[in-house]
Every structure is written in C-alpha cells, then in structure tokens.
C-alpha cells in the first residue's frame, strides 16, 4: 500500500472556521489522528461519533520539541503503511510535526496538506483597520523564536 497522509489545518478554535473540505476529509477518514485532543474541533467530532485518536501522550514523554516532532512524524509514516492517515493540527503551515512529515516523506508516499484559517488570520480580523498589518506580517512559531 502506498503511504498516504493528509494534513488538515483545524484553525484557531472556532469549529465554524473549519473549511468544508477539512471537515469532510476528517469525517470520511479511516484513521484520524489529532496532534492534540485539546482543540474544540476534537470535541465536536467526537460528539458526532467520528472515531479518532490524539498524540497528546507525546507531550508527557518529551522535553525536546524537535525530538517530539521527529517521532510524531515517524509514527505517522509508520501508521500510513497500514492505513491512509488524516492528521489534524492547529496550523499546517507552522506545525513542527508537519515540517518533519515533509522531511521524512518516503519517495513513493503522498503527503497532502489542506489549507485552513490560521491563528494569525483570526487575530488580524479582530484588529481595527488602521492597525491591520496587511502584507506586512511575519509569523514565527514560538519554538523557533
């Protein structure tokens, strides 16, 4: 079986900001894995009867985020040897585990990343027009700062 992972960006927390494409992908997933269950979309999908797991236990096992991200990606690619995987994260564009998925991607494997509303998008939308840094904003994950 060709390894296949689809990454879904969950967004800043409001389930209504989730894209229809991402929601449908998660509902149809045979193997849905959340980076963390500490996201409102996890609760909404669980209440709707969608089966999933999370990688929350990694946070207790690791002190080094780089090592944690490497091992998350390794575990996801291993799981993808048996099932197509949907991996749900806050923001695929800034997530360290997603960066590692790209770095570790086997030659014949498929890695698909679905876009979503970012935390920065949600914050900027709340700013008054004269303060919104349209085109002049650079986001850096705290772990990289």
Predicted segments, located by residue:
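Class I S-adenosyl-L-methionine
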Residues: 1-15, 20-114, 122
